[in-house]
From Swiss-Prot:
Cross-referenced Gene3D superfamilies: Kelch-type beta propeller
PROSITE patterns: IQ
Keywords: Kelch repeat, Repeat
UniProt region (Disordered), positions on chain: 398-427
InterPro entries listed in its UniProt record: Beta-prop_ATRN-MKLN-like, Kelch-typ_b-propeller, Kelch_1
Residue ranges of every copy of the IQ domain listed in the record: 430-459
SUPFAM superfamilies in the record: Kelch motif (SSF117281)
Pfam families xrefs: Beta-prop_ATRN-LZTR1, Kelch_KLHDC2_KLHL20_DRC7
ATP-binding in keyword set: no
Protein name from the UniProt record: Alpha-scruin
Organism the protein comes from: Limulus polyphemus (Atlantic horseshoe crab)
Tissues with expression: Sperm.
């Protein structure tokens, strides 16, 4: 086999680096001649409804495409992957609708195209995505439906189950579109841009969840785009080039060289350095964390689309665009499919030949050559392809009758046919027959097993048991130290193929939770995009004492082993709890604890969603239900008969191994017993303070979503459901305690940015007057303290626990047991007593003359604690109360008053003392 002559690599450094850059106006070439068909298709005929129905009926019953092209009923991908090609249009004969309805299958080991089936409707310039043994066909033009000679874009979604060869119509997209593109990531399918039937270029982005058959609208592309290349790399989706609109002259369009990056977890867009020249109707794949851009089109001197033959490699980290090699024939509007180290380039349009092309080429990354493969049965452009992986491991393929591109001259002695198929053809035929028999036998056994379980009754229970056994086995594999091999070495490990478990764990769980699940509502706040750098937290400022800084590798690994998007399990302590019927007691105030993280098991996000209820007279914790999303180091407040949860870390979102702060606001209404997502804060926050003052909710300070400490303050308007910026603190800080007392908002201690070698722990006190909107200094604390908690009890401010810097040179945080009180007469902070367990990042709640201290981190034990304590203010005693079900830190708690006040505060304190006193 001849080798492709490897050309010299020419590296063009794009301005900038791997950092995100601000938007800048880039010179683009305006033109109104951006038809990807190069104007060859002048007009399409309009069909009557009867003609459309007859055409669809003939195609549905079709058993062959044309003489000489064999049809197959099975993919036959037991040992090697195959490529499916869907639809497209032949520019020479655009009214042959069978071309746009056909599905062809390509077997690389045989180098042969076969007719497979037909689609439910003809499509061209559509997009496909493969997920969980199903191929989804999204949108595209329907040649059967034309208006004024133009094909109409569609919003349909068709699903092909490749094993059974059955089509099914799924939920439509929100927008009809063609010339769009899709990518599959994290069990979701994302659709970007496109063009509608009116010729308008779209910026809309939608996300499809196959298991739920549901579409969600996401943040739009900063500019309308069609004909862009799409690829995902390390959790970020790249939208490369395309055709955009001119804002001043909407009917005209531009070729764009911009690269937009979309972060699905945060629903945000960023910019990367641009391409060296405008490019549209290209294709992109990801290999070795680099993005390969295949062909495309730019503008000629006459202002017409001109196909290009360049294959370039974009390195997102270095910001370089490296020319790798060239196609023999320049092309655009082609389709690509990647299987392992091979990339197949199918069909497309060529301005050189001024027509659609039937070429199929394969790029072999290991040998760095491009090989010609068998031609498509018909020349097609606007085609979409999907790579179907092999069902079982087997010897990887080699294109048998490959002809290298003309730029790669054949070497003497090269053979056009693979040795595997030239030697012993009888053995090959026997192997093919044996594979078919074995495949049908496995299907028969599987069907028989399912029927047997259904006949036994309670099939759901047995299925759940089987699923639990599989998950337990994978967890044991993970704990035993297994690490996945690289993809090309791990293909044969069928036992470790990720499993897809939809809706696991079931929500709501087996406990009768009164909480209702909330769908994530994507908001599109107006934010200026630009460079963002994540600032990791120093060890001297980490409340978790560095125990979670290096968990990202294991976290991602366990998700891969389990095959789950979220590693979550039902808490083991659920069986010990009786489900609470209501969150509010009739006569006694109760304490509600939300979220948190177990430092021993940070990957279990069920802990971060849990809500506990503590009844003081029963001295008992009860499991109440789940929050909509897991949170830790968030803030909570009781406001207008509802529980408000703001900000906090989301364990599912990590950057550089650290959890990322959020800006969400979740509200639980006591009357309706429902969770609702309200308006997001203007700034993402964790380790912040949330309190109510003069019937206004305030969020103060914290750490934002790029790791910086913030000084901003926000207030929430309940009527307009919006957050408003207040006067900022004099300096940024996080981990401070906050109370409302004496007409001021008091901020006690906390951490500030590390600008010197001095420890960042603060001892100062700030007081904010919301009426006159100014900050004043209060009396400093007795010692510098961070991650403490404060409460007002008996009309005094009490500061409980916290962390102070160590006395050695490292200045690491050390938990302190002190309980300090502010004496307003002497204006001094005095230590009143000490806790039995030093702790910081705990929850402190005042209940009449009682202070409850629960959870937190104990630096002396280097772990979170489940021990809880009660400080009786009236008699200055500390009692031990019922422990938390698990050691948690980063919780947030509120006190829920009773429905009707029955006891006086003195009586309630006496009853509590009688309950907890031995």
């Amino acid at each position: 086999m001849a080798r492709y002559r490897k050309p010299e690599r020419v590296t063009r450094v794009i301005s900038g680096s791997d950092e995100y850059v601000d938007f800048k106006k880039i010179d683009e070439e305006p033109t109104d001649k951006l038809d990807p068909n190069l104007g060859i298709i002048k007009s399409m005929p309009k069909l009557e409804p009867e003609e459309i129905n007859d055409t669809l009926l003939r195609q549905t019953n079709l058993r062959s495409f044309k003489p000489g092209l064999s049809a197959v009923n099975d993919l036959d991908n037991e040992s090697t992957p195959v490529v499916l090609a869907f639809g497209g249009i032949n520019t020479a004969r655009p009214d042959e609708y069978l071309n746009s309805s056909s599905v062809f299958v390509y077997h690389p080991d045989r180098n042969k195209w076969n007719f497979y089936t037909t689609m439910m409707e003809p499509r061209t310039y559509h997009a496909v995505g493969y997920f969980h043994r199903r191929v989804y066909v999204f949108g595209g033009y329907n040649p059967l439906h034309c208006r004024k000679g133009k094909m109409q874009a569609t919003a349909t979604t068709f699903q092909l189950t490749v094993q059974t060869k059955q089509w099914r119509k799924r939920a439509d997209m929100r927008y009809a579109r063609a010339h769009h593109n899709v990518t599959v990531m994290d069990e979701r399918i994302f659709v970007f841009g496109g063009r509608d039937s009116n010729g308008e270029i779209l910026a809309a982005v939608e996300m499809y969840e196959p298991e739920m058959d549901q579409w969600t609208t996401l943040a739009s592309i900063p500019e309308p785009m069609m004909g862009s290349a799409i690829a995902n790399n390390e959790g970020i989706i790249y939208v490369i080039g395309g055709v955009t609109t001119n804002k001043e002259k909407k009917p005209e369009g531009n070729l764009s060289n911009k690269i937009f990056c979309f972060d699905p977890l945060n629903n945000k867009w960023y910019r990367k350095p641009s391409l060296s020249s405008p490019r549209a109707f290209s294709a992109a794949t990801t290999q070795n964390k680099k993005i390969w851009i295949w062909g495309g089109a730019n503008l000629s001197e006459e202002g017409l689309l001109s196909s290009i033959d360049s294959i370039d490699v974009l390195d997102p980290k270095k910001g370089t665009l490296e020319h790798h090699m060239n196609f023999e024939l320049a092309k655009h509007c082609h389709a690509v499919a990647k299987t392992g180290a091979h990339v197949f380039i199918v069909g497309g349009m060529s301005s050189v030949e001024a027509s659609a092309i039937a070429e199929t080429e394969m790029y072999d990354r290991k040998r760095n050559i491009i090989q010609r493969c068998s031609l498509l049965p018909v020349a097609l452009t606007g085609i979409a392809v999907a790579a179907i992986p092999a069902d079982t491991g087997g010897e990887y393929y080699e294109v048998p009758t490959s002809t290298p591109s003309s730029k790669a001259k054949p070497q003497p002695g090269s053979k056009p046919t693979s040795v595997k198929y030239k030697k012993q053809p009888d053995i090959h035929e026997r192997n093919e027959a044996a594979k078919k028999v074995q495949r049908r036998w496995r299907r028969y056994i599987e069907q028989k097993s399912i029927t047997k379980r259904m006949q036994q009754g309670d099939s759901s229970g047995s299925t759940m048991l089987e699923g639990n056994d599989r998950i337990s086995g994978r967890i044991r594999t993970y704990i035993s130290g297994y690490r996945p091999l690289p993809p090309d070495q791990d293909d044969l490990s069928k036992e470790l193929v990720p499993v897809s478990i939809p809706f696991w764990p079931p929500d709501p769980d087996t406990t009768d939770s009164v909480f209702h699940t909330v769908r994530d509502q994507y908001r599109n706040p107006e934010e200026q995009m630009g460079f963002k750098h994540f600032y990791t937290i120093p060890r001297q400022m980490d409340p978790n004492l560095g125990m979670l800084l290096f968990m990202d590798e294991d976290y991602q690994h366990s998700k891969k082993v389990l095959g789950l998007r979220s590693v979550e399990s039902v808490p083991y302590y659920i069986n010990r709890f009786q489900a609470s019927g209501t969150i509010q007691d009739n006569t006694i105030p109760v304490i509600i604890g939300t979220g948190g993280v177990d430092l021993r098991d940070p990957m279990n996000i069920a802990y971060g969603r849990s809500v506990f209820q503590y009844h003081p007279l029963k001295d008992r914790w009860e499991f109440f239900g789940y929050m909509p999303q897991p949170r830790n180091y968030h803030a909570a407040a009781y406001y207008r008969s509802a529980i408000y949860i703001t900000g906090g870390y989301d364990p599912d979102v990590r950057t550089w191994g650290e959890m990322v702060a959020t800006k969400t606001t979740f509200v639980y209404e006591l009357a309706s017993k429902n969770w609702t997502r309200m308006g997001d804060m203007r700034c993402a926050r964790s380790h912040h303070s949330l309190l109510v003052f003069n019937d206004v909710l305030y969020a103060i300070g914290g750490r934002d979503d790029i790791g910086r400490l913030v000084s901003s303050v926000e207030s929430y308007d309940h009527e307009s459901n919006e957050w408003t910026m207040e006067k900022s603190m004099p300096s940024p800080r996080m981990g401070m305690a906050a109370v409302a007392h004496g007409g001021y908002i008091w901020l006690l201690g906390g951490l500030t940015s590390m600008t010197t070698e001095e420890p960042p722990v603060l001892d100062d006190v700030l007081c904010y007057d919301p009426v006159f909107k100014h900050w004043v200094d209060g009396r400093p604390l007795r010692i510098g303290r961070a991650f403490g908690n404060a409460a007002v009890c008996d009309n005094k401010i009490w500061l409980c626990g916290g962390a102070a810097p160590s006395t050695d040179e490292n200045n690491y945080l050390v938990s302190v047991p002190a309980i300090d009180v502010y004496d307003e007469e002497t204006m001094e902070w005095k230590q009143k007593t000490s806790l039995g367990c030093p702790r910081h990042s705990a929850i402190v709640v005042a209940l009449e003359s009682c202070l409850y201290i629960a959870g937190g981190v104990n630096s002396h034990e280097l772990s979170a604690t489940s021990r809880n304590e009660l400080y009786m203010v009236d008699n200055d005693t500390i009692q031990t109360v019922r422990e938390l079900p698990i050691p948690l830190t980063g919780m947030a708690a509120v006190t829920i008053p009773p429905k009707c006040v029955t006891f006086r505060s003195e009586s309630l304190s006496i009853m509590i003392r009688h309950k907890v006193t031995p």
